From Swiss-Prot:
Function: In addition to polymerase activity, this DNA polymerase exhibits 3'-5' and 5'-3' exonuclease activity.
Organism lineage string: Bacteria, Bacillati, Bacillota, Bacilli, Lactobacillales
Gene3D superfamilies registered for this protein in UniProt: 3.30.70.370, 5' to 3' exonuclease, C-terminal subdomain, 5'-nuclease, Ribonuclease H-like superfamily/Ribonuclease H, Taq DNA Polymerase, Chain T, domain 4
Alphabetical list of SMART domains matching this protein: 35EXOc, 53EXOc, HhH2, POLAc
GO MF annotation, one: DNA binding
Pfam families, A to Z: 5_3_exonuc, 5_3_exonuc_N, DNA_pol_A, DNA_polI_exo1
The protein, known as: DNA polymerase I
Coiled-coil parts of chain: none
């Protein structure tokens, strides 16, 4: 007889989590009647994921019945102070209940009791009847119910990631038993439920007390023996409050429910009515997947484990997935791969198949349909397989359609209704427990991932076509992935000995600064401790408290606080200098050494699908954040050198590309004229805004202020922000901005128009159809709406600038290949491209690179690329 399994879901909590998991896409989730549906959709995905994984024989979703419960009768402020439930969420609740009805899932609520009490009562009844129980919630209150029969899962991220609490896991994570978890909440209180707890007792202190005394009762039995302290005083004063909090936090496992376990038998959905409901909600993908279970998927797609390969297993229409165990494909291992052919799915962990002549020849001669081409190209290069540019990259396609969430396969599955795939953390585990399971289970996981890709590829293609974004994928992002893969494989030589020399020099500087700080302080202390520094500055040295704010951990010594204090306290300037050099030392001078591989190079990874504007970022290590303003930061670039002695590094950097894009997009005649005439744009702006007649009369301060206004406008800066940047009053800053818009009316018109369009469409686009979703553009919250409006203004500018650089890189790579040059692109940092150029090609290459970048696209103003070359990146910059 199959084991009886009961799934108990805290419906109110999980629905709320589902709402906010898809909140950034709020305006995309509306049905034809205008009803928001993101919570309904997310709730359904959570349910389907749980049904697939838990396979319950019995199930119940419990809801809170209302604000008045037996707890509010004993403590009127219980759950008081909670923010108002968003109307967009409230309107979906009746439909969540309707969804449950159609899915054949019992739901229940009980006057005067909370969902937790219903769950707790059924949990104990089910234990007595021999059930295995899984409880699911969005908050941790229910953890107290875990025992040898009950697992409590708390949703962590999105709609499919949960943290499973058992007694062993709770002990491992917190050192507590389930009963002690109640006592911890009694001590800490709970802001979300407005449970008071004991004043200034947090999690760390609460756990310490419970480990010492065993329970809340034990703490108070031993309180007389505690040392005199503020904590002891608070415990004594708040004793009544602590025991009230324990009562409030304890789940009632004997609630007078009117249902029994026999009422919770799960026999599946009412397919016909559920399909109609999906139609009403506009859930097309869910409708298509309605009759599919994981077993159906595996059987329908003919999953086969492969140890040998033949030509009839391969097709130009095949879709591939290559599984990396880890994140860094330059160093971590390929562990298996899967591919489709017609209706068949194949999966293998036999990596030697990559050397099979049939397979290797196919891979190298076919433009693959694949997930994450750049990763795959770099990985397979390690096996001697050299891929062509891709036919279709599913990861990049998803990224172009939505930048709100990540682009992992599990996320794609959640978004498009494939409920049979578990996320990698759930499947492999995490931390020291992360491991590949037995072979058949592992390969089935790869097959499920591939099934998601097979099912979603046509959906993504259709949506890209509807958005007019196929050209963006085929002509920009996919060719760029090929270029970036080649750059990553090439890497750049970084001389460790140079970094070691810098490390030694910096250590002397840090030691000297430390001694100078001690002398000014009149004592020795830990300069790296914000707490000790705060006490020194604001208590011992008596610096003005209005410059800082005090939190639970002490006085704020953040950079903005210290910069305001620096003019009045010499020690603060030294501390700022110390922090800057210490940061450079630890993060870059020492940090970069760990990323130099056996070939003497750093192989950074360019992340193509992270930013919402389309800009590239780099990780492992991040080379885009190497400090450029400080000389000590710039010196790090001396360690970056060419691979060959007869070569140099050539750096080519777009000049003021975002302002040039702004001129083109806004069609402002004055800005266009200044760029067309080759004028210094900041000097020209200063003349127009400050009423200066001649360029010669523009001071350095005038130009600096004009530059701040120019770039501030690009980022939608406020008068408050500009006043902080320039150290002037808000009134002066507002006058600058008002005058700027008077003198450059095209820019003001652009800003107004792009915000209007964003409100209508819910998104903005670059010159090349790259979209930035703006779900908050019509928010009733002024601050949230204001941020969305600034984003609407900036994204087409910043995104178009990023796109132009991508076009230049693609065209430059084509030119290098066509000309048979030895020159290689090595790095892309912000608006800069760094190449290694043989000296014999330098004259020709400087001309080619400059021409390619400046002619990447025709704007109404010229694009300008500035070049420098040198024996190191430092000299080239």
């Amino acid at each position: 007889m199959d084991k009886k399994k009961l799934l108990l879901i805290d419906g109110s909590s999980v629905a709320f989590r589902a709402f906010f998991a898809l909140y950034q896409q709020l305006d995309r989730f509306k049905n034809a009647a205008g009803l928001h549906t993101n919570a309904i959709y997310g709730f359904q995905l959570m349910l389907s994921h749980l049904l697939e994984r838990v396979e319950p024989s019995h199930i119940l979703v419990a809801f809170d019945a209302g604000k008045t419960t037996f707890r509010t009768e004993m403590y009127a402020d219980y759950k008081g102070g909670r923010a108002k439930t968003p109307d967009e969420f409230r309107e979906q609740f009746p439909f969540i209940r309707e969804l449950l009805d159609h899915m054949g899932i019992r739901h229940y609520e009980l006057a005067q009791y909370e969902a937790d009490d219903i769950i707790g009562t059924l949990d104990k009844l089910a234990e007595q009847d021999g059930f295995d129980i899984t409880i699911v919630s969005g908050d941790k209150d229910l953890i107290q119910l875990t025992d040898e029969h009950t697992v409590v899962e708390i949703s962590k991220k999105g709609v499919a990631e949960f943290e499973a609490f058992t007694p062993d896991y709770l002990m491992e994570e917190m050192g507590l038993t389930p009963a002690q978890f109640i006592d911890l909440k009694a001590l800490m209180g709970d802001k979300s439920d407005n449970i008071p707890g004991v004043t200034k007792v947090g999690e760390k202190t609460g756990i310490k007390l419970l480990l010492e005394h065993g329970s809340l009762e034990g703490i108070y039995e031993n309180i007389d023996g505690m040392k005199t302290s503020k904590m002891k005083e608070n415990l004594i004063n708040d004793k009544e409050q602590a025991f009230l909090s324990k009562t409030l936090a304890t789940i009632d496992t004997k609630a007078p429910i009117a249902i029994g376990l026999e009422d919770l038998v799960y026999s599946g959905p009412d397919v016909e009515n559920l399909g109609k409901f999906y139609d009403e909600m506009g859930f097309k993908q869910l409708k298509q997947a309605l009759n599919m279970s994981s077993a159906d998927v595996a059987e329908g797609l003919d999953f086969t484990i492969v140890d040998q390969i033949s030509q009839d297993m391969l097709s130009e229409e095949s879709i591939f997935h290559f599984e990396l165990f880890g994140e860094n494909y330059h160093t971590d291992n390929l562990v298996g791969f899967a591919w489709s052919c017609g209706d068949q799915l194949y999966a293998t962990d036999k990596l030697e198949l990559l050397q099979d002549p049939i397979f290797k020849d196919f891979l190298e001669k076919t433009s693959l349909r694949v997930y994450d081409f750049k990763k795959v190209k770099v990985l397979l290069q390690r096996f001697g397989v050299d891929l062509q540019a891709p036919a279709f990259d599913i990861r990049l396609a998803k990224y172009l359609l939505s930048t709100v969430e990540d682009n992992e396969i599990a996320t794609i599955a959640s978004l498009y209704g494939q409920t049979y795939l578990v996320d990698d953390e759930t499947f492999y585990g995490k931390g020291v427990k992360k491991a590949i399971p037995e072979r058949e289970k592992f390969l089935e996981h790869l097959a499920c991932k591939l099934a998601v890709l097979v099912e979603t590829e046509p959906i993504l293609l259709e949506k890209l076509s509807e958005n007019g974004q196929l050209e963006l994928l085929y002509d920009m992002e996919q060719p760029l992935a090929f270029v970036l893969a080649k750059m990553e494989i090439a890497g750049i030589v970084v001389k460790k000995e140079t970094l070691l020399e810098m490390q030694a020099e910096n250590e002397l500087v840090i030691e000297k600064l430390t001694q100078e700080i001690y002398e000014l302080a009149g004592e020795e202390f830990n300069v790296n401790s914000p707490k000790q520094l705060g006490v020194l500055l604001f208590e011992k040295l008596g610096l003005p408290l209005e410059y800082t704010k005090k939190t639970k951990t002490g006085y704020s010594t953040a950079v903005d606080v210290l910069e305001r204090l620096a003019p009045i306290a010499p020690i603060v300037k030294k501390i700022l200098d110390y922090r800057q050099i210490a940061k450079i030392q630890s993060t870059y001078v020492i940090g970069l050494q760990d990323w130099i591989l056996a070939d003497g190079k750093i192989h950074t990874r360019y992340v193509q699908d992270l930013t919402q504007t389309g800009r590239l970022s780099s990780v492992d290590p991040n080379l885009q954040n190497i400090p450029a303003r400080l000389e000590q930061g710039r010196l790090i670039r001396k360690a970056f050198v060419p691979e060959w002695e007869d070569s140099v590094l050539l750096s080519s950097d777009y000049s003021q590309i975002e302002l040039r894009v702004l001129a083109h997009i806004s069609k402002d005649e004055h800005l266009i004229k200044a760029f067309q005439e080759g004028a210094d744009i900041h000097t020209s702006t200063a003349m127009r805004v400050f009423g200066i007649e001649r360029p010669d009369n523009v001071t350095a301060n005038d130009r600096r202020n004009a530059k701040a206004v120019n770039f501030g406008v690009v980022y939608g800066i406020s008068d408050f922000g500009l006043s902080n940047n320039l150290g002037i009053s808000r009134k002066e800053a507002k006058a600058y901005i008002d005058t700027y818009f008077e003198r450059f009316p095209g820019i003001k018109n652009y800003m107004d128009e792009v915000v209007r369009e964003a409100r209508d469409k819910g998104y903005v686009e670059t010159l090349f159809k790259r979209r930035r979703e703006l779900p908050d553009i019509n928010s009733r919250n002024f601050n949230i709406r204001g941020f969305a409006e600034r984003t609407a203004i900036n994204s087409p500018i910043q995104g178009s600038a990023a796109d132009i650089l991508k076009i230049a890189m693609i065209q430059l790579d084509k030119a290098l290949v066509a000309g048979g040059y030895q020159t290689k692109m090595l790095l892309q940092v912000h608006d800069e491209i760094v190449l290694e150029v043989p000296k014999s090609e330098l004259v020709e290459m400087k001309k080619l690179v400059k021409q390619t970048m400046e002619e990447a696209i025709q704007l109404s103003v010229p694009l300008i690329a500035d070049e420098n070359e040198g024996a190191t990146w430092y000299e080239a910059k």
